[in-house]
Amino acid sequence: MKHYDLLIVDDERRYADMLAKRLSLRRLTCKVCYNGRTAIDLVGEETFPVVILDLQLPDLYGTEVLTRIKQCRPETAVIILTGHGTEKDREQCMACGAHSFMNKPLDIDRLMDMMARIKERSS
């Protein structure tokens, strides 16, 4: 089984694929999926240290996916990524166990710093 550094979950296929490509240039191995149900299945089958999760997915809202991921893999750091998040959304996600909450467009350098801190903490 291949080891992945992170799972990207976003229904905007072009954005998700572009993000995976940019992160692969930073030597991160990424798996991408485009809906919440697939994300939940993948997290149940494989271990991802980090999940980047869009809040607004077509099949399940991000907080439901987040809750299920944390039930299955409490050690997984989930970073919420959204283009339309409110302060209430941020508070709800953090209460459900999100590691952090970021707005689109994603700042790759900030994400890389966050990934390094997550890796240090889990070592």
Regions found by a protein language model. Give the residues of each.
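Alpha4 helix (beta4-alpha4-beta5 surface) of REC/receiver domains from two-component response regulators
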Residues: 64, 85-100
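The short loop immediately C-terminal to the conserved phospho-acceptor aspartate in CheY-like receiver
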Residues: 55-56, 84
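Short amphipathic alpha-helix used as the core "switch/output" element in two-component signaling
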Residues: 41, 63-74
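Acidic, metal-coordinating helix/loop segments flanking the phosphotransfer/catalytic sites
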Residues: 32-50
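C-terminal output helix
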Residues: 88, 106-115
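Acidic catalytic/metal-coordinating carboxylates
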Residues: 35, 61-64
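Two-component/phosphorelay signaling modules centered on CheY-like receiver
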Residues: 13-31
